[in-house]
């Protein structure tokens, strides 16, 4: 009876952890999508570290949600194979998370370098591509920045002194970027502003990853306890 009561407690805790996994999965997907959308606006498409990291975060979130579903089915039916699968998949997710964290740290300077290079390239396309102009204008509005390093970058692009896009203005009005006064525009560059935003979100992801890792370890332990109990039941039968 004591063993049966203990297993009921293990199953209850496992159900709680599975709900936490679902919440974490949704959070990872949201952060991954948000980061990807920001990078997608400025960095050239391709299989670069800049694009792969958000994709990995999204994939881990989606896989974690699937694993939580498998764990829920296994715990509910007390199915030995499903619980073993759950424990193995959870271990694989932890390995992927560690690999992603290492890759993010190793390629952090490369991401910034690519971001700066591609942002400047899109600035060159600003006068001749309306879609690019719209994207850069939105970024400059949202991040309250101007140019790549600072507002003077636009003088080289627009080939006109004392002129920046209207999206650089603190209070945006038509042609406010012509013959501007410095105090009336955002002077900081977008590369540093967006890099700061990414660093902030990386810290959030890192903190969340530590919490998720602890929950995953606990989930593996509880799954193993339930597997042992199920196997003991088979042996008795």
From Swiss-Prot:
Gene Ontology cellular component? cell surface; extracellular region; late endosome membrane; lysosomal membrane; melanosome; multivesicular body membrane; multivesicular body, internal vesicle; plasma membrane
Motif (Lysosomal targeting motif) on chain: 233-237
Asked if the keyword DNA-binding belongs to this entry, the reply reads no
The superkingdom of the source organism is: Eukaryota
Localization, UniProt: Cell membrane; Lysosome membrane; Late endosome membrane; Endosome, Multivesicular body
Which UniProt keywords are given for this protein, alphabetically ordered? Answer: Cell membrane, Endosome, Glycoprotein, Lipoprotein, Lysosome, Membrane, Palmitate, Protein transport, Secreted, Transmembrane, Transmembrane helix, Transport
The record places the following residue ranges in the Cytoplasmic compartment, namely 1-11, 73-81, 224-237
Q: Which InterPro entries match?
A: CD63_LEL, Tetraspanin/Peripherin, Tetraspanin_animals, Tetraspanin_CS, Tetraspanin_EC2_sf
PTM per UniProt?
Palmitoylated at a low, basal level in unstimulated platelets. The level of palmitoylation increases when platelets are activated by thrombin (in vitro).
Matching CDD domains, A to Z?
CD63_LEL
Topological category with respect to the lipid bilayer:
Multi-pass membrane protein
Q: Which family does it belong to?
A: Belongs to the tetraspanin (TM4SF) family.
| Function as written in the Swiss-Prot or TrEMBL entry | Functions as a cell surface receptor for TIMP1 and plays a role in the activation of cellular signaling cascades. Plays a role in the activation of ITGB1 and integrin signaling, leading to the activation of AKT, FAK/PTK2 and MAP kinases. Promotes cell survival, reorganization of the actin cytoskeleton, cell adhesion, spreading and migration, via its role in the activation of AKT and FAK/PTK2. Plays a role in VEGFA signaling via its role in regulating the internalization of KDR/VEGFR2.
Q: What is this protein called?
A: CD63 antigen
What is the species of this protein?
Bos taurus (Bovine)
């Amino acid at each position: 009876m004591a063993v049966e009561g203990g297993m009921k407690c293990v199953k209850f805790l496992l159900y709680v952890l599975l709900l936490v996994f679902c919440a974490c999965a949704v959070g990872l997907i949201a952060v991954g999508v948000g980061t990807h959308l920001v990078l997608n606006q400025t960095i050239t498409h391709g299989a670069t570290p800049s694009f792969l990291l958000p994709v990995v975060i999204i994939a881990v979130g989606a896989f974690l949600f699937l694993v939580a579903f498998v764990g829920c089915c296994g715990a509910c039916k007390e199915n030995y194979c499903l619980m073993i699968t759950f424990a193995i998949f959870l271990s694989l997710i932890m390995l992927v998370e560690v690999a992603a964290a290492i890759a993010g740290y190793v390629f952090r300077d490369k991401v910034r370098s690519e971001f700066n290079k591609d942002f400047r390239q899109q600035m060159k396309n600003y006068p001749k591509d309306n879609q690019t102009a719209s994207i850069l204008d939105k970024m400059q509005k949202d991040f309250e920045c101007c140019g790549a390093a600072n507002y003077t970058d636009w003088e080289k692009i627009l080939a006109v002194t004392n002129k920046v896009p209207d999206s650089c203005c603190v209070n945006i009005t038509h042609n406010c970027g012509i013959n501007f006064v410095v105090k009336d525009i955002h002077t900081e560059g977008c590369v540093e502003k967006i890099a700061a935003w990414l660093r902030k979100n990386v810290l959030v992801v890192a903190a969340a990853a530590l919490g998720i890792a602890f929950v995953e370890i606990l989930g593996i332990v509880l799954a193993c306890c339930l597997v042992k109990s199920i196997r003991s039941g088979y042996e008795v039968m």
